[in-house]
């Protein structure tokens, strides 16, 4: 079994969470991590488990307009935000809609502002809905991690790593494999 973590990140927070999730997941399953712009069909075809994530923008997944707004924020003279190199490309929404041969298993995660979920919404819920509609089976409930400013809180990174570890165990169980048998 192999896992692929595909993420969209504007300012680095979702990227950090994707790496932490992959670290936890790799304790049970060999795992690769790719930004959405680099996740091609070959990488997808090699995976049995897709872990897809992105930032929450305006109550859900990013859109072209919200990504353009993030680019403007980072470019403002008073801004201390650093844009990820792949930030202005297509997001996780566009990637999922165009991806062929999705793995049979998936998990979804997002990052969001440190506010009540009913105020911020959740990209992970929408990601999960798309992947279920495309025929994949959800392994665990979506993971949501707080992303304050341009530097995700260390406790959230730890939570993401633990979520990845639990995901690995659940994915193996879904496949009828024990963690010790790897």
Please place each PLM-identified region on the residue numbering.
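Helix-loop-strand module that forms the ligand-binding subsite of alpha/beta enzymes
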Residues: 36-134
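Short, well-ordered alpha-helices that flank and scaffold nucleotide-derived cofactor binding pockets
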Residues: 19, 23, 27, 129, ...
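Short gly/ser/thr-rich secondary-structure transition/capping motifs
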Residues: 28-37
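Glycine-rich phosphate/pyrophosphate-binding loop and the adjoining helix
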Residues: 132-182
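Short histidine/acidic/glycine/proline-rich micro-motifs that form metal-
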Residues: 11, 112-118, 145-150
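N-terminal beta1-alpha1 ligand-phosphate binding loop
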Residues: 2-28
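Hydrophobic anchor at the start of a short beta-strand
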Residues: 3, 31-32, 138-139
